[in-house]
UniProtKB/Swiss-Prot annotation:
Compartments (UniProt record): Cytoplasm; Nucleus
Sites bearing Phosphoserine, chain numbering: S424, S426
Family, as annotated: Belongs to the dwarfin/SMAD family.
Organism (species): Gallus gallus (Chicken)
Name of the protein this chain belongs to: Mothers against decapentaplegic homolog 3
InterPro entries on file: Dwarfin, MAD_homology1_Dwarfin-type, MAD_homology_MH1, SMAD-like_dom_sf, SMAD_dom_Dwarfin-type, SMAD_FHA_dom_sf, SMAD_MH1_sf
Disordered: annotated segments: 167-207
Cellular component, GO, one term: heteromeric SMAD protein complex
Summary of subunit composition and partner proteins: Interacts with SARA (SMAD anchor for receptor activation); form trimers with another SMAD3 and the co-SMAD SMAD4.
Length: 426
């Protein structure tokens, strides 16, 4: 705490003494400014004692500690902006917090961020981390009729997909409304985040509830097949037109970006700017210049989100997302700059898998396609665009979701699949 200046008020020093994690000099100074900013606001409203009580007792039964909501919902400290509840939860509880997606308000919080009131609660003990739900094992009967070979997957890559815009046209198949920020909310680095007018389908919806085993299966030997979280939650391949470029990126971090810059890639960034291609044409070159900050991918609580950080839209083809909204499986959704879309949900997939087991080997194998997500930068494809297939777009990526794919492999093996490996490339 050596960086604290001599005139730092005692209350600020005490509150900083409770912060979590180790920070470097610059970060420590920023934390001090964030606490000073909050102390100044709370002095005016007489809530300072309640803040100190909440931080020192770590008690969820303390009162809401509120500050006025700004127009865009963010709080500026020095030259950085962020959502206030995320800033103070990170400072006093979870230094590894990446995003507001990872937080859920406690029931007794009257001014929770998602309530969209004029005041927002920043009591760190009025929020909890979103936990990844435990997926129930799939009960799999061993079939006696084994297919001689894998059935052909429904392949939409060469068909002309329908198009939809985000958030227009997003009508869920149930009345479940998730806790999401209102339109216009911005993420911490200055991009509009989670305009999610895309309520996800309730896991209890009739369309997604796992069916009980049919009577024909009652006397069969049922084996539970469990979901295991892999070390790398997804693998990302980059393409220019129909040619794959560079090595596959394996994502291990819950939040990572794919961008157009030339920095060396690391566990949290896949930088496309450094990748070379002798066959690259002028259209691809031009598109690459507009990728910019690209897309941020989150894997939190068993859900995958894509947030467009670029100044140009991204275009996403996610069969899981399309099923949620009742669209054709090949529909391509345009995500404008700053918007955020849930592109995969493990619980929905688990329910579909449990249903498909009752329908036989082929129905389960068809779910392989659902574990692949395609995403193009700047230029879209589909019926409303000049480019009608993803391989006609200058720059695009393909995500393989490793956890669901490996789960499918295990289920198919238990069902008595052929000895060859079933995967997204089988």
């Amino acid at each position: 705490m050596s960086s604290i200046l001599p005139f730092t008020p005692p209350i600020v020093k005490r509150l900083l003494g409770w912060k979590k994690g180790e920070q470097n000099g610059q970060e420590e100074k920023w934390c001090e400014k964030a606490v000073k900013s909050l102390v100044k606001k709370l002095k005016k409203t007489g809530q300072l004692d309640e803040l100190e009580k909440a931080i020192t007792t770590q008690n969820i039964n303390t009162k809401c500690i509120t500050i006025p909501r700004s127009l865009d919902g963010r709080l500026q400290v020095s030259h950085r902006k962020g959502l206030p509840h995320v800033i103070y939860c990170r400072l006093w509880r979870w230094p590894d917090l990446h995003s507001h997606h990872e937080l859920r308000a406690m029931e007794m919080c009257e001014y929770a961020f998602n309530m969209k009131k004029d005041e927002v609660c920043v009591n760190p003990y009025h929020y909890q981390r979103v936990e990844t739900p435990v997926l129930p094992p799939v009960l799999v009967p061993r079939h006696t009729e084994i297919p001689a070979e894998f059935p052909p997957l429904d392949d939409y890559s060469h068909s002309i997909p329908e198009n939809t815009n985000f958030p227009a046209g997003i009508e869920p198949q149930s009345n479940y409304i998730p806790e999401t920020p209102p339109p216009g909310y911005l993420s911490e680095d200055g991009e509009t985040s989670d305009h999610q007018m895309n309520p996800s389908m309730d896991a209890g919806s009739p369309n997604l509830s796992p069916n009980p085993m049919s009577p024909a299966h009652n006397n069969l030997d049922l084996q539970p097949v469990t979901y295991c979280e892999p070390a790398f939650w997804c693998s990302i391949s980059y393409y220019e037109l129909n040619q794959r470029v560079g090595e596959t990126f394996h994502a291990s971090q819950p939040s990572m970006t794919v961008d157009g810059f030339t920095d060396p890639s690391n566990s949290e960034r896949f930088c496309l700017g450094l990748l070379s291609n002798v066959n690259r044409n002028a259209a691809v070159e031009l598109t690459r210049r507009h990728i910019g900050r690209g897309v941020r991918l989150y894997y939190i609580g068993g859900e995958v989100f894509a947030e467009c950080l670029s100044d140009s839209a991204i275009f996403v083809q996610s069969p899981n997302c399309n099923q949620r909204y009742g669209w054709h499986p090949a529909t391509v959704c345009k995500i404008p700059p700053g918007c955020n879309l849930k592109i995969f949900n493990n619980q929905e997939f688990a329910a579909l898998l449990a249903q498909s087991v009752n329908q036989g080997f082929e129905a389960v194998y068809q779910l392989t396609r659902m574990c692949t997500i395609r995403m193009s930068f700047v230029k879209g494809w589909g019926a409303e665009y000049r480019r009608q297939t993803v391989t006609s777009t200058p720059c695009w990526i393909e995500l393989h979701l490793n956890g669901p794919l490996q789960w499918l492999d295990k289920v198919l093996t238990q069902m008595g699949s052929p000895s060859i490996r079933c995967s997204s490339v089988s």
